[in-house]
Amino acid sequence: MGNVEKRNIIGDRVRVARISANPKVTQLELSARLQIQGVMIGDSTIGKIENGASAVTDIQLLAFAKALNVSVLWLLGIEG
């Protein structure tokens, strides 16, 4: 399929935060957490975000941070 242009910079960290959570959070569970915040992103789209194939809005960025209990700066790779 070749190289696909990355459409976001948070995908890798979303995956890391989701998998390293205790207990681990599935893409389906993350989708439910986002929906509670009014952000409708399905589990298949979360997979695309994690792979860098789908763009993320600022509202979605904030919702991901809240749902995963991490900072926006961490998701953006600005803080360690």
Question: What is each stretch, according to the model?
Answer:
Residues N22-K48:
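Short alpha-helical DNA-recognition segment
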Residues M1-E5, K48, K66, L76-G80:
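Short, charged recognition helix plus adjacent turn
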Residues D12, L28, S44, D58-L61:
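Short alpha-helical elements of helix-turn-helix
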Residues L34, E50, Q60, E79:
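DNA major-groove recognition helix of helix-turn-helix
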Residues T57-W74:
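DNA major-groove recognition helix of helix-turn-helix/homeodomain DNA-binding modules
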Residues M1-P23, E29:
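A short, Lys/Arg-rich alpha-helix, primarily the initiator
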